[in-house]
Amino acid sequence: MRNSLTMVGTFWAFLSLVTAVASSTSYFLPYWLFGSQLGKPVSFSTFRRCNYPVRGDGHNLIMVEECGRYASFTAIPSLAWQMCTVVTGAGCALLLLVALAAVLGCCMEELISRMMGRCMGAAQFVGGLLISAGCALYPLGWNSPEVMQTCGNVSNQFQLGTCRLGWAYYCAGGGAAAAMLICTWLSCFAGRNPKPVMLVENIMRNTNSYALELDHCLKP
């Protein structure tokens, strides 16, 4: 089955899918930051959290051991994490869109030309840059009261305190770096250059199709 990608392009499509899935999965999983509170493990992402304290009987704090997202966007602990949520989400969406188009290029002929591949590579660079910006913004929220309670009350911006970064944070950053550096470069060689004969055939086919449709419309 012919497709619109070269051998390098096929590898580019596969790597694009891997990086997009890795970054997007890491974005949704609440394993960016690990700490503890009231003797229970606690983990965060930008907009989700696992295990949180609530007031029990007698107004004592007890830990609810479950994962969930914050009730609203404004409930996210800090402005930096709110910005991180938006920026990283936009980057993941862009990488997923390019990955989907790249995979379709493996199955459809004449979908991705050499120029189109380079444009998609530029989009991947922007997507990776957005995710990288989100990862850079994330430490700015470590001084929020909610995070400080989890990190021994000694955390601050770019200071973890007793907490540690989780694997999802590294996975998101790694996926962004791969998209920016490797996928962007491979995209320059992904699409096939259309052959002149093929271009003429396509033009003639489209012209004949339009002529038939016009003739059909003009008939009484």
UniProtKB/Swiss-Prot annotation:
<keyword id="KW-0325">Glycoprotein</keyword>
<feature type="transmembrane region" description="Helical">
    <location>
        <begin position="86"/>
        <end position="106"/>
    </location>
</feature>
<protein>
    <recommendedName>
        <fullName>LHFPL tetraspan subfamily member 1 protein</fullName>
    </recommendedName>
</protein>
<feature type="signal peptide">
    <location>
        <begin position="1"/>
        <end position="20"/>
    </location>
</feature>
<feature type="transmembrane region" description="Helical">
    <location>
        <begin position="122"/>
        <end position="142"/>
    </location>
</feature>
<keyword id="KW-0812">Transmembrane</keyword>
<dbReference type="GO" id="GO:0016020">
    <property type="term" value="C:membrane"/>
</dbReference>
<dbReference type="InterPro" id="IPR019372">
    <property type="entry name" value="LHFPL"/>
</dbReference>
<feature type="transmembrane region" description="Helical">
    <location>
        <begin position="165"/>
        <end position="185"/>
    </location>
</feature>
<comment type="similarity">
    <text>Belongs to the LHFP family.</text>
</comment>
<feature type="glycosylation site" description="N-linked (GlcNAc...) asparagine">
    <location>
        <position position="153"/>
    </location>
</feature>
<keyword id="KW-0472">Membrane</keyword>
<keyword id="KW-0732">Signal</keyword>
<keyword id="KW-1133">Transmembrane helix</keyword>
<dbReference type="Pfam" id="PF10242">
    <property type="entry name" value="L_HMGIC_fpl"/>
</dbReference>
